[in-house]
Amino acid sequence: MKKSLLKSKLKQIFLKHKLSKNHAEICSNYLIKAEILEAKGHGLARLKMYCDRIKAKVINPKPKIKIKKISSSISYINADNSIGFVGADIGIKQAIKNAKKTGIGLVAIKKSGHYGLSSFYAEQAVNNKLMVFCFTNAPAALAPHGAKKSLFGTNPI
């Protein structure tokens, strides 16, 4: 399937699930990018999960995202249970803005969901000639050595 047709179909799906045009565009772009990078677990394979979470009201399709400036370098974002791509996209843009102004851009995001590959956001900072450290939390999936109960997520931190 051609990229333009796939993007059009994805946008239609997200719009049907009540995302704004801008948010549908953001989500479609990141899903396609994951497929191009052959990160299948973060691409189209996740589409049903996102749609199911919207239907279950776990993801808010019309979030009222709030950015709070803590200082010139630090911002805090309440993503209002947005789809993760949207909260993270706003977050990296804010971090870049802060870093260009002060040399450091630190952004914490709460009430967001699965956001795909961290590299999506890190690449934007690198393209702006900035160093970046981008990470997220993850549910307990791995047990410490010798333990029976999962404690660690599969994220690097």
What label would you give each PLM region?
Residues 21-32:
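Short, well-structured alpha-helical segments
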Residues 10, 95, 121:
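Aromatic/hydrophobic pocket-lining residues that form π-stacking "cages" and hydrophobic walls in ligand
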Residues 45-96:
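Active-site cofactor/substrate anionic-group-binding motifs, chiefly glycine-
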